[in-house]
Amino acid sequence: MLKSYRARKKPAYNAACFHAQQCAEKYLKARLVEAGIVFTKTHDLINLLSLALQVESTWASLQPELDALNKYAVEYRYPGRSATKAGAKDAVADCRKIRGFVRAALGLPV
């Protein structure tokens, strides 16, 4: 993700946004699995958040970041729209915030 964002000659901002979404998704799913919460196959971060709120009520504050990342599951994955440097930077920052919350909940170093 950071490699895509930091590339010098041809930054892959689309890839950075997509991978930020994927990273957040995998972290949320890890917390759900750890808590024994069953979920269906989905890439919808808001759906995953609603399930996680059963065990992590303070995570409601993550909704703005998850809303922003949610669109990257498909929006920039296919030709058409392109992410900007600012958008990629925001996506990486949002992902890092979510990562911190989940790692703390799992007792891992943040």
Could you say what each language-model-derived stretch is?
Residues 1-110:
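Terminal alpha-helical segments
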